[in-house]
Amino acid sequence: VGTALGSLAEELNGYNRKKGGFSFRF
């Protein structure tokens, strides 16, 4: 589960960077 969560967080970070909008903080 921890690995999946990390992967999701990384994907979200990349998506936000692409959009250049807001940043996610966990």
UniProtKB/Swiss-Prot annotation:
It is found in: Secreted. Brain. One of its GO terms (biological process) is neuropeptide signaling pathway. It comes from the Eukaryota. It holds the Pfam family RFamide_26RFa. GO terms for cellular component: extracellular region. Belongs to the RFamide neuropeptide family. May have orexigenic activity. May promote aldosterone secretion by the adrenal gland. This is Orexigenic neuropeptide 26RFa. It comes from Pelophylax lessonae (Pool frog).
